Amino acid sequence: MRTPSTHPLLTLAAALAVAFSSVNALAQRTATAPGSFAMVAHHAVNGVAEIVAATPNGLTLVYTSADAGTLGLVDITTPARPQTLPRVDVRVGGVGEPTSVAITPDGRFAVVAVRMDDDLHHARRGFVRVFDITNPRQVKPVKDITVGIGPDALALHGSGKTLRAVVAIEDEESDAKGDATLGGQRPGRIDVVGLQSLYGGTDSGLQSIELVQALKALPGAVYPEDPQPEFVSIDHQNHMAVVSLQENNAVALIDLRHPRKAQLLKVLSTGTVVRRGNADLQKDKEIALTDSFTGRREADAVAWVAPGVFATANEGDGKKDKAGVMPGGRGFTLFNTRGNVVFETGAATEQNAVRHGHYPDGRSAAKGVEIEGVAAGSFGGVPHLLVSSERGSFVEVYRVSNPAKPELVQLLPTGLSPEGLATVTRRADGQQLFITANEVEGSLNLYRFHPQGAPANPQEPQLVAHEGIAWGALSGLTTDGTHLYAVPDNAFGQSRIYRINAAEHAQGRMVIDQVTLLTEANGQPLKVDPEGIAHVADGFWVASEGTTVDGNELIKVNTAGVVQQRVKLPAAIQARFANPKTSTGFEGVAASADGHTLYVAIQRGFDLAKPQAAIVKWHIPSNTWTTALYPLAQHSQDAKQFWMGLSEITLLPDGRLLLLERDKGGGEGKAINAEVKRIYSVNAADVTEGAVLTKTLVKDLRRDFNYLQEKAEGMAVLNGDLWVVNDNDGAGWTRLLNTGKP
């Protein structure tokens, strides 16, 4: 697929069948138990959401928001309806960022690691701050303990008068860009902090565990004189902590059996992953898992999945070395405490991401799906492992009854860039949950475990592809009455059309079963920016957005994907744009039943300074062009930053044109700012020259469907129901939604 075949129907089966065989083999091991998860809430928060923890009763979530220096609290008494509670400022003298939070076993206290603006030139020690959260609506500070420079993750061991915190003191010596200094002058360490006095005991004080000598003695350790502890997980049964030393490509095991004195047991190398012919190392707008590499695992998160067995999230954080060894393993690994690999995911996680539209080609040359998080919990009495991808915005769920043979249960979409994971397994009402904290968009996702299998959701079926089809960035939608068809935008190099088979939508699933590559008449690949598509009897019209006004095009292709005609706006209409060098964009196209008339949505009209989009009508037989103006709503908070535009147009048999109007809120614009995601109708007959159209609300996606995705971009009516899909920018949650009758 890197140099796509010019044959019009591209299944890629021949190119990728071998690469996907391990996914199929893994999938065949999933039928031993029926339990699975379903998303019950996607909750926007104010600011970012990074590390998340849950109270033991499973009724309250606490998450860190570093940019604001706060803890956020959310009431999840009813998981499907989270309620935001007042935030808590954790800064000291107005300075500091929370990097981690853990909840005591009785749920009384939140223990927070706070980094104090240390950097390459300022060695400021951090704090462990304790807050009383007995009443989550009235959180009270309790005590502060000074720890080392740059605390990162922490975890708790013991309870009551034996309670201690194990803190990863990273001291990454950040430079002006915020990047860690590798091989720095200030070695990190592991601090063990006594918290016994919270329950009337005598604190064991601060014990610092140095790592330099152990790393120097470890073959293959990277930057051994600069330990950088990252993440902590505790095996409560064996009283042992595993701490990832990410940049050092190692983990440390800490013995916590003595109630007042911790001991370094050993440091283990996390070694390398070797991928042969099943990775994508090129950022080229094509997804082809055909390359090879060797990568240092460089684990970020770690989690105990069974006594004596822990998982590593092989994110990678360094650079390619002189031998060509890359940072990151692009998957996860299970190790035992001897340092032996119990299980290695290899290519399976990335192959799974490709099939579900979550593979981030823009990260191919770096770290691929960038697995950052792992968490473990017992659901339905069975051990499970959760594996999250920061760049792909998904979680894989595995059963680990046998750590040597994890069983893939499912892949679930998350909000943009999941950073933290938490499990809830002991609620009084029996509900078991897991939660993701999604940093970039500022949201929490809640998923509920169903012991007999999650019920099908035909309103929001999961979209998957046949083996060998890479997909994403769906920017336009149409139908032939039997199938849906979608185009991706220029996230892919060669333009293409996907066919979506809706036969299984009642079972909560739709399948991309065919992809047609678009070519010029001479056989050369067509490389444009498709933003809309309309089905006609002898093929499709594609609306391509140009980088300038003159670059906007309507492109006719036949059923084989070969270009038949390319049409630009007439010069008289182009002259109406306030700035011809700035395209406000073709964003959708609709065709009349006879194919004689096209309607085109121009995202932001002719003048960016005016809150108006435009509709252009082209009567093909007479070559007559007509323009009308469409009034846009305005964002209530910041109309400039969260500008409004049209992203799709659909013509109904009753003569109404449906327009999908949206703001820039959601995604990188933060979920809490997703305000306008609406479908309006206008009468097609009213599209006359110079008219200002009157719009009528048909669907409010934000209000009625909690639609927090930024780019709601595709819309089509199939079997009487109006379907909407978002552009995931190439990787992430593709939300295909049946909104009902238009």
Regions found by a protein language model. Give the residues of each.
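Sequence/structural signature of beta-propeller domains
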Residues: 28-742
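Gram-negative bacterial Sec-dependent N-terminal signal peptides
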Residues: 2-26
